[in-house]
């Protein structure tokens, strides 16, 4: 386990490589020579430079792309915050293994490997309206599981999650980190009715009140109000930064899971791109707070890494244009 204390983890969050300015500038310079008006490929151009910065090479590659789906169960579901029972988490992990979920199809189309990592599904986190979701030991174990999952031979990673009830901790973390109260951040998740939405708001308000003493520390927020799969995504996002691997973030839960890193370090999420904006109401607000403009807006709210996986082919397109387009000189095309 790479992190044996919160102090060790905090130190790792403050020691973040900045990426390669040289590689990013080389990509930008090449983009300006290609057979197109400068800047006309929009974000495809900046995506190519982003890849170069974090891979540390002026000709990035996407030979190995992997989607990680972390799964966990939540004690706060006892408050009636989800339309589905917690056993669906285990059932969906089996569905992933059988190839029957949306993420299986999207990963295949994207040319990405899929790694599903269940986290102690038989032991839900604590109900954060009553106790911290995780004590220090459980939190560090989950963070370490995510950190250890990411390996240096990967070129791009996507993070997703599965966990019945996990939009509730996502909203709670967002409220704790950025303020505004529970109602501002709370949506319908898997489709709760008005009464269920009210229960979510009440549960989040109770959690924020009970754990008020922990809310000044982003790591305290993640432990008290989060979940194992969220902590693992946090750890995986940190590992990717240390290893120089760019990250596509999925929806609301995934973004909330990574958000404490941005509160610990001003450039904590610079190696990430928000793949899409979810239909879950808090996600757009969270992306705005983090300064992460999404690539896609398709009205999705599935999770599983589905939106992140869809964005892989946009990143592939950016790289293909950068690598294979001719320059004006090579093509014999006159410049203005």
From Swiss-Prot:
In terms of SUPFAM superfamilies, this protein maps to: Nicotinate mononucleotide:5,6-dimethylbenzimidazole phosphoribosyltransferase (CobT) (SSF52733)
Top-level EC class: transferase
Name any Gene Ontology BP term.
Answer: cobalamin biosynthetic process
Q: Spell out the protein name for this chain.
A: Nicotinate-nucleotide--dimethylbenzimidazole phosphoribosyltransferase
Name its pathway: Nucleoside biosynthesis; alpha-ribazole biosynthesis; alpha-ribazole from 5,6-dimethylbenzimidazole: step 1/2
Q: What does this protein do?
A: Catalyzes the synthesis of alpha-ribazole-5'-phosphate from nicotinate mononucleotide (NAMN) and 5,6-dimethylbenzimidazole (DMB).
Give the organism the record lists: Mesorhizobium japonicum (strain LMG 29417 / CECT 9101 / MAFF 303099) (Mesorhizobium loti (strain MAFF 303099))
Domain of life of the source: Bacteria
* Entries under NCBIfam families matching the protein: cobT_DBIPRT, PRK00105.1
Q: Per the similarity annotation, which family is this? A: Belongs to the CobT family.
**Which reaction equation describes what this protein catalyses?**
5,6-dimethylbenzimidazole + nicotinate beta-D-ribonucleotide = alpha-ribazole 5'-phosphate + nicotinate + H(+)
Matching HAMAP family: CobT
């Amino acid at each position: 386990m790479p992190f044996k204390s919160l102090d060790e983890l905090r130190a790792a969050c403050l020691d973040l490589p900045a990426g390669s300015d040289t590689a990013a500038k080389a990509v930008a310079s090449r983009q300006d020579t290609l057979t197109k008006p400068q800047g006309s490929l929009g974000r495809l151009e900046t995506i190519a430079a982003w890849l170069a910065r974090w891979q540390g090479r002026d000709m990035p590659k996407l030979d190995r792309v992997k989607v990680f789906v972390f799964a966990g169960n939540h004690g706060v579901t006892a408050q009636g915050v989800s339309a589905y029972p917690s056993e669906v988490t285990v059932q969906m992990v089996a569905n992933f293994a059988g190839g029957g979920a949306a993420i299986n199809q999207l990963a295949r189309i994207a040319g990405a490997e899929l790694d599903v990592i269940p986290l102690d599904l038989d032991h839900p986190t604590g109900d954060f309206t009553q106790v911290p979701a995780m004590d220090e030991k459980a939190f560090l174990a989950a963070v370490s599981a995510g950190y250890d999952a990411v390996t240096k031979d990967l070129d791009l990673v996507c993070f997703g999650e599965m966990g019945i009830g996990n939009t509730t901790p996502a909203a709670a973390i967002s409220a704790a980190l950025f303020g505004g109260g529970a109602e501002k951040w709370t949506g319908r998740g898997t489709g709760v009715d008005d009464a269920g939405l009210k229960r979510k708001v009440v549960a989040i308000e109770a959690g924020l009140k009970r754990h008020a003493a922990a809310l000044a520390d982003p790591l305290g927020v993640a432990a008290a109000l989060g979940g194992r799969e969220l902590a693992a995504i946090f750890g995986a996002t940190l590992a990717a930064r240390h290893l120089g691997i760019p990250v596509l973030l999925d929806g609301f839960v995934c973004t909330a899971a990574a958000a404490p890193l941005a509160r610990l370090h001003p450039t904590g999420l610079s190696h990430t791109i928000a793949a899409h904006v979810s239909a879950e109401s808090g996600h757009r607000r969270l992306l705005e707070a983090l300064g992460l403009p999404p690539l896609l807006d398709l009205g999705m709210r599935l999770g599983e890494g589905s939106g992140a996986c869809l964005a892989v082919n946009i990143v592939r397109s950016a790289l293909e244009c950068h690598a294979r387009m001719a320059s004006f000189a090579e093509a014999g095309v006159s410049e203005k």
